[in-house]
């Protein structure tokens, strides 16, 4: 589920575990700063060994991915003007990719999740609390 602001800019994308039905599904275009995909591989499927070549890239903002391992998390998604655009509940196996705007998380009971984002990360300058 794509979450857009009032100007149709992509803020986030929520992927439910049960919705991962295609062998490979890229949710972002190749030109985007952050690539986001899901895979549903059959037994013995092989992704060929590979190395990602080093190359300079221009990254203008930090994208973040949250994967819920256990429990339930409420995610609030805000536009660039800090207006709440969407709230959603993520359960075990669900994922949200946060591309633009702001966000907040709340654990609904004990929860575990993995967070992935680009680095380097400077806690002094990388984010603004609101």
What residues fall within each predicted segment?
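Glycine- and acidic-residue-biased ligand/ion/polar-headgroup-sensing regions
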Residues: 43, 61-78
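Conserved short histidine dyad/triad with adjacent acidic residue
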Residues: 39-60
């Amino acid at each position: 589920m794509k979450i857009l602001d009032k100007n149709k800019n992509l803020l986030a994308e929520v992927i439910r575990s049960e919705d991962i039905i295609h062998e490979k599904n890229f949710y972002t275009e190749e030109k985007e700063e952050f690539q986001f995909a899901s895979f549903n591989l059959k037994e013995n499927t092989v992704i060929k060994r590979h190395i990602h070549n080093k190359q300079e890239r221009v990254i203008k903002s930090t994208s973040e991915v949250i994967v819920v391992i256990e429990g339930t998390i409420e995610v609030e998604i805000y536009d660039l003007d800090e207006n709440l655009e969407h709230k959603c509940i993520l359960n075990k196996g669900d994922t949200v990719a946060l591309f633009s705007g702001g966000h907040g998380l709340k654990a609904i009971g004990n929860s575990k999740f993995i967070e992935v984002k680009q680095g380097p990360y400077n806690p002094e300058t990388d984010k603004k609390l609101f």
